[in-house]
Amino acid sequence: MSKFWSPVVRALEPYVPGEQPQIDGLIKLNTNESPYPPSPKVLELMTHDAIDRLRLYPDPDSKKLKATIASYHNISPEQVFVGNGSDEVLGLLFMAFFQQGKAVLFPDITYSFYPVYCKLFNIDYRTVPLNDNFDIDFNDYPQDNSGIIFPNPNAPTAIGKPLAEIEALLQRNSETVVVVDEAYIDFGGQTAIALIGKYPNLLVVQTLSKSRALAGMRVGFAAGHKDLIAGLDRVKNSFNSYPLDRLAEAAAVVAFEDDSYFKRCCNKVIATRDYTVRELEKLGYQVLPSQANFVFAAPPAGNAAEIAQYLRDHKILVRYFNKPRINQFLRITIGTDEQMQKMIEVLQQY
């Protein structure tokens, strides 16, 4: 701690990401990355000409990527905002929309970056407990708020919400912004982007880190009414006028264009997830219903921390959260068939 730190910095409890260890032969199932490489067309971008152009600043408006995303989702480019990963997009929207004098609402068990943003930007917040089934119950969300944000599917529980329930929430909360954080939507959920033309207070955030395998490029975006997007642009341009580097933007464009590769990879992850759920349940694990590229599973003896260490000793890394209500669960990213078979074999020997 430095004497030069501001009171805000002194009070912060930064987000702690999953480990990125450099261990030979490690099966890494702890940060929900794709087990498959990006589209082969991404590699084709890495030409001498592309590298040479890195000496030039990128397009500050990311017009080509916005147009690509808009075309993919049948919306207008002015309804799209892009940023350096969805975490940056989320941070900017907290600043843009949630400093309204009332509490912003989000689940008590959810993405742990949300309270970090609130403390950083001095935003009042209130967490709403998940129900006994670890599901979000929108009936528990009061209308007196400065905004609502939740992941769909939720993280780390992996449980998704149907569009009908999201639309009902929007109808009850027409005076504040509702943010649907769709980092894992491509593994079985239905995106709410189709609703942005109907609800001017809806903002949908997605990332290319999971289903499109570009975690190392840091690309995220938001879709919403053009006035919400304009607000995000105002905040972004007060920090950094160049949101994406040239290679990241080009890679993101082709990741959307190669739709057949994207769908094949998603389908493989879903099939492997179904296999993993079946095998874990055979071992007596409680596995919450998943619409994500991971499962949230509780071992029968309730010894999740011990199992996490046991797997680590066998060079298999999963995520354990030492937090109330979920400290008997493991979050397990879906890897390749071979990786998940290996994990099951190791668990069978426990």
Curated annotation (Swiss-Prot):
PROSITE patterns: AA_TRANSFER_CLASS_2 (PS00599). It catalyses: L-histidinol phosphate + 2-oxoglutarate = 3-(imidazol-4-yl)-2-oxopropyl phosphate + L-glutamate. One of its GO terms (biological process) is L-histidine biosynthetic process. Pathway: Amino-acid biosynthesis; L-histidine biosynthesis; L-histidine from 5-phospho-alpha-D-ribose 1-diphosphate: step 7/9. The keyword Protease does not apply. Pfam families: Aminotran_1_2. NCBIfam families: hisC. This is Histidinol-phosphate aminotransferase. The lineage of its organism: Bacteria, Pseudomonadati, Pseudomonadota, Gammaproteobacteria, Cellvibrionales.
